[in-house]
Each structure stands twice: as C-alpha cells, then as structure tokens.
From Swiss-Prot:
The gene is mtnN. This is 5'-methylthioadenosine/S-adenosylhomocysteine nucleosidase. Catalyzes the irreversible cleavage of the glycosidic bond in both 5'-methylthioadenosine (MTA) and S-adenosylhomocysteine (SAH/AdoHcy) to adenine and the corresponding thioribose, 5'-methylthioribose and S-ribosylhomocysteine, respectively. Also cleaves 5'-deoxyadenosine, a toxic by-product of radical S-adenosylmethionine (SAM) enzymes, into 5-deoxyribose and adenine. Belongs to the PNP/UDP phosphorylase family. MtnN subfamily. HAMAP family: Salvage_MtnN. SUPFAM superfamilies: Purine and uridine phosphorylases. Substrate binds at G78, I152, M173, E174. Keywords: Amino-acid biosynthesis, Hydrolase, Methionine biosynthesis. It is an enzyme of class 3 (hydrolase). It comes from Haemophilus influenzae (strain ATCC 51907 / DSM 11121 / KW20 / Rd).
Length: 229
C-alpha cells in the first residue's frame, strides 16, 4: 500500500518529510510531492499550498503521479465546536464547503452541481485515526469539517457558519477540495487536523503561536496511522 498525505504549508509537512527515507521530490505548478518510505511504508507526501485551488491542483497531481491507495489530509484547523481547545484533534466523517452557494437552483448550502452536498470520509480510515488518537492520549472530536477560502477570525463569521452547518467541528481552507478530488478519483480519504485557534478575533495571533503544536500533534497521529496501514 502507498499512503498519500496532504498538508498545505511547509510547517504542516516538515516533521513527516524529515522522517522520510530515500526521499525524492517532484514539483508540479505550486505543489511539491515528496516520495519515499516512513517506517518502512511507501508514502507520497504533498505540500499543496494554501487554499482550495492549490489543494485541488496538488491532490490531482498526487493521485495521477504517485497513485496512492488512500489520502490523509493533515495540518491545522480552527476549532469551532464546543469544548475544543488548541492541540485537540478533529477527524472528518464528512467535509463540506462553507463558502459555496448554488441554493438558487435547489442545491444544499455548500453543494456544487454534479457533486454530493457532503464528501464522506472513509470509515475505516476515520475509525483508525480515532483509535490511534485516543491511544496517544489526544482529545478527539469527530464529525463535519468545513472548508472555504477564508481564514476565519471573527465571532460573526463563526456564527454564520454554525447557522448554515450546526454540526461543524472545525474550519480550514483545503480539506473539502482534497475530498472532492479524491471523490472524483474514487480514492478513500480522511482529514485529521489539530486545532491551532478558535476561529475568533484572536485567531490570527493564536494560529501563529500554536501552528507548531498543531503540526506536531497531527503529525504524531499520521505516523501512528502509517504504522497500521
């Protein structure tokens, strides 16, 4: 099995990249794909760049060139569900766009034409992620993760997203685009991200301060998954 891993930023993939043996590097547009072995397992690690378009470009290149059997999206997220704190883990059961709106034509909020309203994560991958996170002593919340091309940093923005998607756990900028590409290529995926901020007015300062912790927590979980896949 070859495991595909996607992170947007250099900080989000650095730990995993540095553990990779026999590493090769391929650049496609703004994306970088590192291939090699981690703990003896074949891994293709994508640093996609930030945002939905960059994530879609990179994930398409990853699936076409490296041909992984599954995809794990790692990195950081804003925690909006009650009780989440910095360093906690969110695992996707499904992902949706919070900034897509074609409701004028009868689609659900967040749904794009010719696509499902939600992209469902692979249950086996999500179950495995939850099992490993709990064994590692990490605090975990599982459910809906919403994506959009905005860094959420105000209570008003959170309130709007929660009004549209009451069950949302975390918000970020790439996961649903990655999920849409995986759906199109019929490749199982899951999102495992660590909370870096609360999406509120202090989010930008919190993100800068706690991104290294979020990267460490999410990378530890991904490493545990690699060992089991």
């Amino acid at each position: 099995m070859k495991i595909g891993i996607v992170g947007a930023m250099a900080q989000e993939v650095e730990i995993l990249k540095n553990l990779m043996a026999d590493r090769t590097e391929t650049r496609v547009a703004s994306a970088v794909i590192f291939e090699g072995k981690i703990n003896g397992k074949d891994v293709a690690l994508l640093q996609s760049g930030i945002g939905k378009v960059a994530a879609a470009i990179g994930t398409t290149a990853l699936l076409q060139l490296a041909k992984p059997d599954c995809v794990i999206n790692t990195g950081s997220a804003g925690g909006v569900a009650k009780g989440l704190k910095v360093g906690d883990i969110v695992i996707s059961d499904e992902t949706r766009y919070h900034d897509a709106d074609v409701t004028a034509f009868g689609y659900e909020k967040g749904q794009l034409p010719a696509n499902p309203a939600a992209f469902l994560s692979d249950k086996k991958l999500a179950d495995l992620a939850q099992e490993i996170a709990e064994k590692q002593g990490q605090s975990v919340k599982r459910g809906l993760i919403c994506s959009g091309d905005s860094f959420i940093n105000s209570e008003d923005k959170i309130a709007q997203i929660k009004a549209d998607f009451p069950n949302v756990t975390g918000v970020e900028m790439e996961a649903t685009a990655i999920a849409q590409v995986c759906y199109a290529f019929n490749v199982p995926f899951v999102v495992v991200r660590a909370i870096s901020d609360g999406g509120d007015g202090k989010a930008s300062m919190s993100f800068e301060e706690f991104l290294p912790l979020a990267a460490k927590q999410s990378s530890a979980l991904v490493l545990g998954m690699i060992d089991r896949l």
